């Protein structure tokens, strides 16, 4: 019999990113490369931009394979959106750096979210994590419609019988 987690237990688990790395403050690429090696933890203030302030980067977790939801952080971006990013002919780490540095700030989105974007991509930083004020890299992804992302898949979808 499995015990249901209380809200307090869920909050504690969500806040437990693992080891806290402070030596990568302002060293975004080094922070991401380190997290790719250790696959756990959070790098505090790894990125800073004048219009949004400091951003922490956590290893996080990929989407739940059964629901396709719930992922966050660098692990989520690399696992769940890495192939989309490679379609832009960028290494995912370099792509994240590019968007963090040069993406246009769009503050018209959801509450507690910062959107940095271009014509075909979006990176999201959350400003609150389970009720705690913290700017954390959440996700990055391709905004192109399926037909432009993956023309082969779009052709297959058009050929599929209608239900």
Predicted regions and their residues:
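Ribonuclease/tRNase effector modules and their secretory precursors
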Residues: 1-163
């Amino acid at each position: 019999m499995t015990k249901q987690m209380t809200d307090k237990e869920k909050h504690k688990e969500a806040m437990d990113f693992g080891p806290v790395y402070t030596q990568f403050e302002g060293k975004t690429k080094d922070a991401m490369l380190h997290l790719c090696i250790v696959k756990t933890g959070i790098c505090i203030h790894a990125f800073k931009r004048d219009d949004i302030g400091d951003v922490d980067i956590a290893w996080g977790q990929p989407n739940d394979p059964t629901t396709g939801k719930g992922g966050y952080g660098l692990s989520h971006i690399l696992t769940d959106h890495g192939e989309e990013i490679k379609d832009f002919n960028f290494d995912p780490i370099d792509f994240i750096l590019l968007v963090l540095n040069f993406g246009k700030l769009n503050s018209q989105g959801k509450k507690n979210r910062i959107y940095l974007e271009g014509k075909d991509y979006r990176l999201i930083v959350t400003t609150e994590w389970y009720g705690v004020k913290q700017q954390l890299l959440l996700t990055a992804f391709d905004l192109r419609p399926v037909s432009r992302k993956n023309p082969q898949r779009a052709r297959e979808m058009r050929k599929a019988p209608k239900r």
